[in-house]
Amino acid sequence: MQWLHTLPPPLQDEVAALISAVPQAAPTLDKLFEYASNSPQKQKIPDPPRKKRQQTSAPPQLPPPLTQADIIFHLSNISCQSPFRKRLGFAFHLALGPQGPVPALSLVNNQLQPEFSLMNLGQDIVFCSLLPILGNSTVSSKKDTVLLLVWLAHGDPIVCQLNFDAVKKQLVAEGKVPASAESELDSESEEDDAEGIRPINEALVDFLVRQFQLCGIRLLNYLPFSTGSKNKLTLNKDTALALSTNGTSVNDVVIVQAYRGSKDGALVLLGGTQDQPGTIIFGFRKPILLFRANSVKRISYSNITRLTFNVSVTVHNDTRPDGEETIEFSMLDQAYFQILDDFVKRQGINDDSFNEALREKQKADPNVKAETDAEDAEAPDSDDEEEDGTYQAGVESDSDNEKKEEDGEENSEDEDSEDGEESEDSEDGELSEDGESDDLSLS
C-alpha cells in the first residue's frame, strides 16, 4: 500500500481506519487504486475556465495640438469641475468649418490638444456667466476666486474656477496686461476693505467679456465690484448673497444655500436682461439644474418655520403627462425669505403658496418623491472629494415651536441666539492652497 502516502492526510486517515477495521479490504483497495491510475476512462475534474482579461480600450485619439496662429484667447491651467474634473486650458481658437474658419471653444491639455470642443458656439452655448462662490465672497483672500459657467444645449455644462491672481500673472507674462496696472488701479481705489473683487480683477473681467464678444458669446458678469456704481453686494453671508447690477437696493442676483433631498447646494436666481429671461440654477458639486424664469409656471412656499422654509418651483415639462414638473428645495434659511420672495415677485412669477389643491397634488405626486429618493441614493463621485454629509436633523414644525414656547419661554432668547450663530457660521467650505474650492462648485 505504498500509494497510501500519495493521498491527502484526511483521506489517508480514513483509508487506514477502513483497513484496520476490515483487513481483507486491503487487496481490493490496491486493485482499485491501480485501476484508477491506469484506466484511460479515469475521471478528471476539469480546471475552471480562466476568465478572459478585459481588454482595456485604448484612450481616444486626441486631435492635433492647436497652433499659436489659431488661438484667439487662452487661459492655461485652470481648475475645471465639469465636464472633466482636472486642470485644463480654456481656449477660443479658429477651426475649419464648412464655409471656412469659425471660432470654436476647446478645453485643452498642456500640449494644447483639445480634450473637449464646441464647434458651433451659437447653437451649443445657452448661457454663459461669471458668478461669485458662496463662502468665498466673505473672505478677502478668497473673494477673487470665482465661477465661470458655460451652460450647453446638450451634455454637462463647462464649470471652471478662475483664480484671478493666476489669470493676472499669465496675462502679465504674455504682455497682454501691463505689469504696473495692478499698483496703478489699487492706488486709485479708495476702499481697502471693499467687499467686491479687487480693481485689477475688475479690469480683467472687462477683458474677458471682450474676448467672449469677439467670438460671438455674451459673458454675463455677476461679480461684485469694489469701484464704480454697478454690481454692488446688498447681502454677503457665508450661506447667502445678493447683488444689484445697478448699485441700487433692487437685487438682480440672489444665491442661497438650499437642500434637494439630503444634498446641500446653492440655489441661484438671476434676473433677466433686455434680451435674455431670468435664470434659475441649482447644483451640488456642479450645476445640475438650469431653467429660464419664463418657463416657471408657479412657485410656492411650504414647511415655513421660525428657522427655515421650503420652496417648490413648477416648470413646463412636455415629457410629463400633465405638462409640468415640480422641483422642491428645502431648508432655506428663514432670514433670506424676504429677499428671495421680493426677487420672485419682480420676475412676475406666480406665487401659488395658498393653493390647497396644489399642495395635495404635490403630496400625491410620485415624481417628486422619486426624484428626491434618487438624489438621496446618488453614488459618490469617483474623484478624491470627500463624500457629502447627509443631513439628518428633523424640520422643526410650527406646532413644535409653540409647544416649546409654552413649556419654557425663558429659554427662547438663548435658543434664538444659538440658532442664529449656527446659521451664520455653517458651511464655510474648505479651500485648497491656491484658493480654489475642491468641493461645491456653486457653494
UniProtKB/Swiss-Prot annotation:
Keyword terms: Chaperone, Chromosome, DNA-binding, Nucleus, Transcription, Transcription regulation
Chaperone found in the keyword field: yes
Single GO molecular function: nucleosome binding
Compositionally biased spans, kind Basic and acidic residues: 358-372
Segments for region (Disordered): 38-64, 358-443
Gene3D superfamilies reported in the protein's UniProt record: 2.30.29.120, Pleckstrin-homology domain (PH domain)/Phosphotyrosine-binding domain (PTB)
Localization, UniProt: Nucleus; Chromosome
UniProt keyword tRNA processing present: no
Acidic residues compositional bias, start-end: 373-389, 407-443
A GO-annotated cellular component: nucleus
Family: Belongs to the RTT106 family.
Role this protein plays: Histones H3 and H4 chaperone involved in the nucleosome formation and heterochromatin silencing. Required for the deposition of H3K56ac-carrying H3-H4 complex onto newly-replicated DNA. Plays a role in the transcriptional regulation of the cell-cycle dependent histone genes by creating a repressive structure at the core histone gene promoter.
Subunit structure: Interacts with histones H3 and H4.
Protein name as catalogued: Histone chaperone RTT106
Organism annotation: Meyerozyma guilliermondii (strain ATCC 6260 / CBS 566 / DSM 6381 / JCM 1539 / NBRC 10279 / NRRL Y-324) (Yeast)
Recorded name of the encoding gene: RTT106
